[in-house]
């Protein structure tokens, strides 16, 4: 009796294994995103609301930021320069053909600590490293997963970003516009189908956990539908220019703060960043944290700000974000950059058109798209990221602004410097 399996049956079995494992990766990614955001929400509530309500310690913000920064510095000195951002993680996957997964708990702790003390960074850094690390662990320990490890790692990273930002297509475009190749041997249609399976699983797990135990980070709020007037289209060039100025400022300060941070020894640099963060937060609390909750507040109270104050906040937010990233209070830059773009858009629109809601929303959308385009060089990714944040009718204008921004800003920030942290 011939026990040889037909090529068709083997192919079907491999395809089913691929689909099932991608669904599992998506589910794990969704669960990890929820866990990170829930711990962050509980920790932030304790440190910044419950504890201050029980004590009346002077200079509380400075104390928490400096003490937390010192802990982060010591942690990084012992365990290494974590967390790593998406670009660094995927670059290691491309060049080294693997990603080290032995430090996943360290990555999670390193991602959480800066967020808890109010660092001006987002939560995405660290998540992708954990997901990709899990995929390579599976490749090393599960026979059927070995040949598709790189595919799994890219899909896992894409799903985690999409679930985190509540933007279904953002993750796949972020990974695709980053990678030099497609998802290995997969065809375009198959790739999107597999990503859809993983995303459905990830979103389902995240939504289920949020419904059962409460959500963590709520994500950026959505702007209401507004009427776009002829004046807004005429002002598009000005808004794009403002976004380009912010993008250039972000890249220049990224390089400057990186060069300055190299002159500081380990731990001292983190303490310095914590001191700057604490002093800034004592006078301008809106500059602390990643910016998603602050943006929700800003949407309701922007008329209480002077336009020039909002413009100044945009520049200070980018400067503080780069200071935190380069001096060791590391995290992602997407949330703070979006907040800065919205502040600049609001400020410019209010200067020219007054506080009318339609004008300021359009200004915020175009400035933010141009800013992100200039920093990321990925107009499709920018469009997918902002798609659920701004009204659908602005979709084409957001893409145009992001495309212009990605072409006109040529200053490229240097690779983020790493301090000489000794691993003991």
Describe the residue ranges of each PLM region.
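Alpha-helical transmembrane segments and immediately membrane-proximal extracytoplasmic
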Residues: 1-424
């Amino acid at each position: 009796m011939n026990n040889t399996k037909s090529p068709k049956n083997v192919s079907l079995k491999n395809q089913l294994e691929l689909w099932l494992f991608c669904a599992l990766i998506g589910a794990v990614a969704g669960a990890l995103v929820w866990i990170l955001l829930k711990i962050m929400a509980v920790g932030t509530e304790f440190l910044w609301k419950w504890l201050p309500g029980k004590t009346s310690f002077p200079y509380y913000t400075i104390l928490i930021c400096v003490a937390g920064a010192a802990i982060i510095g010591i942690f990084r000195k012992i365990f290494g320069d974590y967390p790593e951002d998406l670009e660094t993680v995927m670059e290691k996957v491309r060049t080294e053909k693997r990603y080290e997964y032995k430090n996943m708990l360290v990555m999670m702790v390193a991602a959480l600590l800066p967020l808890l003390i109010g660092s001006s960074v987002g939560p995405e850094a660290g998540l992708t490293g954990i997901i990709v690390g899990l995929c390579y662990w599976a490749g090393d320990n599960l026979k059927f997963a070995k040949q598709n490890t790189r595919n799994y790692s890219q899909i896992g990273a894409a799903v985690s970003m999409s679930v985190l930002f509540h933007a279904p297509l953002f993750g796949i475009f972020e990974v695709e516009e980053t990678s030099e190749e497609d998802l290995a041997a997969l065809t375009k249609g198959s790739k999107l189908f597999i990503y859809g399976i993983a995303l459905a699983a990830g979103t389902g797990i995240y939504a289920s956990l949020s419904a059962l135990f409460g959500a963590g980070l709520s994500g950026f709020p959505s702007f209401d539908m507004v009427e776009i007037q002829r004046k807004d289209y005429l002002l598009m060039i000005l808004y794009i220019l403002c976004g380009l100025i912010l993008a250039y400022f972000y890249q220049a300060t990224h390089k400057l703060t990186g060069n300055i941070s190299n002159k500081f020894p380990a731990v001292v640099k983190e303490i310095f960043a914590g001191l700057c963060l604490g002093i800034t937060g004592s006078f301008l609390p809106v500059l602390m944290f990643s910016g998603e909750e602050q943006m929700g507040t800003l949407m309701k109270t922007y008329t209480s700000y002077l336009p020039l104050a909002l413009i100044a906040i945009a520049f200070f937010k980018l400067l503080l974000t780069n200071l935190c990233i380069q001096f060791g209070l590391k995290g992602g830059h997407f949330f703070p950059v979006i907040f800065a773009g919205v502040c600049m858009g609001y400020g410019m629109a209010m200067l020219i058109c007054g506080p009318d809601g339609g004008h300021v929303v359009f200004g915020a959308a175009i400035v933010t798209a141009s800013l992100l385009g200039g920093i990321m060089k990925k107009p499709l990714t920018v469009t997918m990221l902002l798609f659920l944040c701004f009204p659908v009718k602005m979709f084409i204008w957001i893409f145009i602004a992001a495309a212009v921004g990605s072409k006109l800003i040529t200053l490229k920030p240097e690779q983020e410097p790493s301090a000489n942290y000794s691993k003991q």
